[in-house]
A protein has these predicted regions:
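Signature of N-terminal electron-transfer/Fe-S-associated modules in redox systems
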Residues: 1-180
Length: 180
């Protein structure tokens, strides 16, 4: 049973998270970009906002988005699970997605992923004990000519990731957090 199908300790199904007025205002700005009868088109933007504010999209968060947009909860869950940019569980301060599609794999993507596993002391999909890093495989990031590539926090693309560049990246992120 996945965490999205989990129930509370009392056995009750998950309840939607309470959305703050600020969150509702941000949702409303996204919904306003679409015709009223197509407000569900804002689902990805609303999920991104929720993740920015809460760090991940929980089952309860999915329910809140579904209620806000008038969607079936399963339709929101399908979006959350289809796209790897949505974290369904808490992740580290720095989420590192290493491209594992064929062009990156042929140019060292697999070795880069292994190097990061060793350097961080985690398995693929794991989070470091200090909560600083989560390491995940990723789908094509659209930069095949720059392989191997990785993405930090779904926003910062890093290209041509040699062992030296991987070490510099980890050291730089640790230094940025004061954990050198």
């Amino acid at each position: 049973m996945s965490s999205h199908a989990s129930h509370s300790a009392a056995g009750a199904p998950p309840q939607p998270v309470a959305l703050s007025e600020s969150t509702r205002a941000r949702f409303a700005r996204e919904v306003a970009k679409y015709p009223a009868e197509q407000k569900q088109s804002a689902v990805m933007a609303c999920l991104s906002i929720l993740q920015q504010e809460q760090g991940h999209v929980s089952a309860e968060g999915e329910l809140a988005v579904a209620e806000y947009l008038g969607m079936a909860p399963m339709a929101v869950h399908e979006v959350t699970t289809f796209y790897n940019m949505y974290n369904q569980h808490p992740v580290g301060r720095f989420k590192i997605n290493v491209c594992t599609n064929l062009p990156c794999t042929l140019r060292g993507g697999g070795q880069a992923l292994e190097r990061l596993c060793q350097r961080l002391g985690v398995a693929v999909g794991g989070t470091t004990a200090d909560g600083l890093f989560t390491l995940q495989p990723g789908e094509c990031m659209g930069a095949c000519a720059d392989a191997p590539v990785l993405l930090v926090n779904d926003r910062n693309m890093c290209s041509f990731m040699s062992d030296d560049k991987l070490d510099q990246l980890i050291d730089g992120l640790r230094n940025a957090e004061g954990q050198a």
